[in-house]
């Protein structure tokens, strides 16, 4: 019987580390729920699990498409559900672990979101992208105010997708969405910590990314794919791109990454806190693994 354990929360709360420890103890595999880790070559800036970590525990839904391709929530849902239902996935009787901070990815699985199956239209996207994010968001507010309330004004990818769905189908994306929860048992675990401690975690991780070669990664990606690649305008990459262009210093780029990541984490916390099914744990608890282990055991005992 399929059983799913979700580990979610804001960025830099230690989800991947907890998931690795749980997976090794349970004999489970990990399904990533991160909207940027699906792309190959975007490694350091997305905090993608290392090859060593992936050798310890099998990871899925990482490196599944090229940076020039588009992974929609519908694409992710389809691939994730196929894996969850696959008799070939080596997890039974252990539960699957769904791990990440992309709320829509997790919601698409846990709540069985009904998502419009609208293929990306490169020509339409190109026309829309030329208008700039500010104008695009204003357009979204006009054609789909419900979606605009759920999408941040700086979220280029989701704004673009919502407009794309509207202009192709003539129906707002918010009207095409519904929910059909799966019939298998699900345990949802959330990690959180004090805001100031989270800020320190974010700063430490940003410094580690820079030490691991983030600048070289961004430079390589800019040369290979061009400066206009949408992924290079996302968190951690856009700031280094500004540095490489000579617009800001490396220290300024670092501080911007920290600031923007803290802002992003705040939005993530707000998103996940809206779901009462999530059982929360302190990411800084030295006994975190054992604290989490108790509800995991209860979940497995009660779902057999």
Regions found by a protein language model. Give the residues of each.
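Phosphate/pyrophosphate-binding catalytic cores of soluble transferases and nucleic-acid-acting enzymes
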Residues: 1-304
